[in-house]
C-alpha cells in the first residue's frame, strides 16, 4: 500500500493521470508487459482491473503541470493498494521516472521468523508485508477498496501481527475506536471506527 512518485517534464497545463491496481486484465497490459510474463493470467475484467466494477471505483490521482522543467509529484493525502501502476499523459509530457512509495503506520519489529526453507521464509516475508499494507492508524481489511477496521479481519490476523510487530499502542488506540462504537444497549459495531 502506498502511492506512486512520478517525475515528469512537459508544458504548463498538461495533465498526468496515475492509475493503480493489484493485477491488470490482459486487455489492460501495456505493450512491454506481455501476459505470458505474468505468473497469474487474468482474463476476467471483473476480477482484476484498473477499474473495479464490483464497487464502482478507480484508484487514481492526477497532476497538472506547471511547465517549469522537471516536476515531481506524489499523492500524499490518500494511499492505494497496488502492484501495477499505469501512467498516461497529455501530448508533450515526458514521464521520466515512476517509483512506488510504501506507506503504513510505523510499528517496530517485535519478532522475526527465519528457517532453512526458502519457501517458508518467503511466505513469512509476504505475510509481514500484507500486515503492514493494512496498518493505517487502524487495522484495515484491505488497502485498495473498503479500507475499514472490520473486527473479524483483525481477529484473524492479530496473533500474526503481535508476533511480528510491537502492536501495543496501535491496538490500544483501535480498542478505543471500538469502544466509541458502543450503543446504549452495550452492543459494539462490527467496524471501528464507524
Over which residues does each language-model region extend?
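Short, charged/polar micro-motifs that form catalytic or ligand-binding hotspots
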Residues: 75, 147, 161-164
Amino acid at each position: 500500500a502506498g502511492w506512486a512518485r512520478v517525475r515528469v517534464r512537459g508544458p504548463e497545463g498538461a495533465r498526468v493521470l496515475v492509475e493503480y491496481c493489484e493485477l491488470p486484465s490482459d486487455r489492460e497490459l501495456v505493450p512491454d508487459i506481455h501476459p505470458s510474463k505474468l505468473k497469474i493470467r487474468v482474463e476476467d475484467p471483473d476480477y482484476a482491473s484498473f477499474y473495479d466494477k464490483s464497487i464502482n471505483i478507480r484508484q487514481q490521482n492526477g497532476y497538472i503541470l506547471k511547465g517549469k522543467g522537471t516536476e515531481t509529484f506524489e499523492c500524499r493525502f490518500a494511499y492505494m493498494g497496488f502492484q501495477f501502476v499505469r501512467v498516461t499523459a497529455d501530448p508533450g509530457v515526458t514521464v521520466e521516472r515512476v517509483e512506488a512509495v510504501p506507506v503504513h503506520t510505523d510499528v517496530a519489529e517485535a519478532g522475526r521468523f527465519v528457517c532453512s526453507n526458502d519457501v517458508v521464509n518467503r511466505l513469512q516475508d509476504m505475510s509481514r508485508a500484507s500486515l503492514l499494507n493494512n496498518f493505517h492508524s487502524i487495522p484495515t481489511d484491505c488497502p485498495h477498496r473498503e479500507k475499514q477496521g472490520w473486527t473479524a479481519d483483525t481477529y484473524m490476523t492479530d496473533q500474526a501481527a503481535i508476533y511480528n510487530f510491537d502492536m501495543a499502542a496501535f491496538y490500544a488506540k483501535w480498542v478505543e475506536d471500538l469502544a466509541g462504537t458502543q450503543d446504549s444497549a452495550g452492543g459494539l459495531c462490527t467496524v471501528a471506527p464507524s
